[in-house]
């Protein structure tokens, strides 16, 4: 569906060339929700703007739906852009137009007749949950409602691809989840390919099928979200995963608890997919002559399945503890010893 081959974007500056995107290679499948995550300055905003040619690549090739979009210009590019919708962090609405008129705007530009425009706007207002707000102006809307207008406007021309540029960064956590649920629903209903960029791992976890991690203009890691959670390869990816699995408060709590358990071993168990539902600790206590104390635990749901971790204290004879650890490995649960007694 979307293919990036050796794509590079270089900006000219007085201080010298700035490489915002450095030889990016990506393949995004039709109908998937693909996330790009990175900290500020990583190059993710420049990357997503290459998809619809708001930015032109310095080199490389971008193909969307079998069309080399990086090689077209003029009316052909304008037509191609109608098949690529985009929503923004700060909504980019026309403040002098109502909700209906904002959604209708791209249809006007495309030359759609008035009756067809009215019908399409009605459909979109229903799709994004803005019934009764069609005559309101942006200044009368909440942040979440403004983004719903942005989504409806982006879908007006029935695009194949929806680009989301930090679409939830200006929203509170509850509204963020509502917008993410809406995007997930639209993806399922319409079979729409969604590409989103964010600096929040929560967004990736909640709705993305796969993720690419960017750092200093380079794509340093890609993969299914659950695989990245389970086994992050790069230091930056590990930091993003720790946003959800290990907060500073959690680490401080574990450290203080470890001091209370000078004997035995403190281990971290990681559960992926079906392993989350296995009674691992129950089996452990049934077959081992050791004491098991749960110090901390959490479970996160990704779009590919569940991911969980437990920090537990194992106390008993060294031989019994080692046998227990071997039994945990047999249950296909990853284990890391984080403190020895």
From Swiss-Prot:
Keyword entries, A-Z: Amino-acid transport, ATP-binding, Cell membrane, Membrane, Nucleotide-binding, Translocase, Transport
Protein name: Methionine import ATP-binding protein MetN 2
One protein family per Pfam: NIL
Family: Belongs to the ABC transporter superfamily. Methionine importer (TC 3.A.1.24) family.
Function, in words: Part of the ABC transporter complex MetNIQ involved in methionine import. Responsible for energy coupling to the transport system.
Keyword Nucleotide-binding: yes
Gene Ontology cellular component list: plasma membrane
Organism in which the protein naturally occurs: Bacillus thuringiensis subsp. konkukian (strain 97-27)
Membrane topology: Peripheral membrane protein
EC number assigned by the record: 7.4.2.11
UniProt lineage: Bacteria, Bacillati, Bacillota, Bacilli, Bacillales
PANTHER family: AMINO ACID IMPORT ATP-BINDING PROTEIN, METHIONINE IMPORT ATP-BINDING PROTEIN METN 2
PROSITE patterns attached to this UniProt entry: ABC_TRANSPORTER_1, ABC_TRANSPORTER_2, METN
Enzyme class: translocase
Known catalytic reactions: L-methionine(out) + ATP + H2O = L-methionine(in) + ADP + phosphate + H(+); D-methionine(out) + ATP + H2O = D-methionine(in) + ADP + phosphate + H(+)
Main location as per UniProt: membrane
Record GO terms (molecular function): ABC-type D-methionine transporter activity; ATP binding; ATP hydrolysis activity
InterPro entries (UniProt xref): AAA+_ATPase (IPR003593), ABC_transporter-like_ATP-bd (IPR003439), ABC_transporter-like_CS (IPR017871), ACT-like_dom_sf (IPR045865), MetN_ABC (IPR041701), MetN_ABC_transporter-like (IPR050086), NIL_domain (IPR018449), P-loop_NTPase (IPR027417)
Record-annotated ABC transporter domain positions: 2-241
């Amino acid at each position: 569906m979307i293919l990036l081959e050796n794509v590079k974007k270089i900006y000219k500056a007085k201080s010298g060339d700035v490489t915002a995107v450095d030889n990016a290679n990506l393949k995004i499948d039709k109908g998937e929700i693909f996330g790009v995550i990175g900290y500020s300055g990583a190059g993710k905003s420049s990357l997503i703007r290459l998809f619809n040619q708001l930015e032109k690549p310095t080199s490389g090739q971008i193909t969307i739906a079998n069309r080399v979009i990086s090689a077209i210009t003029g009316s052909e590019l304008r037509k191609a852009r109608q098949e690529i919708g985009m929503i923004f962090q700060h909504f980019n609405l026309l403040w002098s137009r109502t909700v209906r008129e904002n959604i209708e705007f791209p249809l006007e530009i495309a030359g759609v007749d008035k009756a067809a425009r009215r019908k399409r706007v009605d459909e979109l207002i229903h799709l994004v949950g803005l019934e009764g707000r069609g005559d309101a102006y942006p200044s009368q809307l909440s942040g979440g409602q403004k983004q719903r207008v942005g989504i409806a406007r982006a879908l007006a021309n029935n695009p194949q691809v929806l680009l989301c540029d930090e679409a939830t960064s200006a929203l509170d956590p509850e509204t963020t989840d509502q917008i993410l649920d809406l995007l997930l629903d639209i993806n399922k209903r319409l079979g729409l390919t969604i590409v989103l960029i964010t600096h929040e791992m929560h967004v990736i976890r909640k709705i993305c099928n796969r993720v690419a991690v960017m750092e200093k203009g380079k794509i340093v890691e890609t993969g299914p979200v659950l695989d990245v959670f389970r086994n992050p390869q790069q230091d930056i990816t590990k930091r993003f995963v720790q946003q959800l699995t290990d907060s500073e408060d959690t680490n401080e709590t574990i450290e203080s608890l470890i001091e209370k358990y000078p004997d035995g071993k403190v281990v971290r168990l990681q559960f992926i997919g079906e392993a989350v539902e296995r009674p691992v600790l129950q089996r452990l206590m049934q077959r081992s002559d050791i004491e098991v104390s749960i110090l901390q635990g959490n479970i996160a749901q990704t779009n590919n399945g569940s991911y969980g971790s437990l920090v537990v204290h194992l106390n008993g004879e060294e031989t019994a503890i080692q046998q227990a650890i071997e039994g945990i490995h047999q249950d296909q649960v990853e284990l890391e010893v984080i403190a020895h007694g």
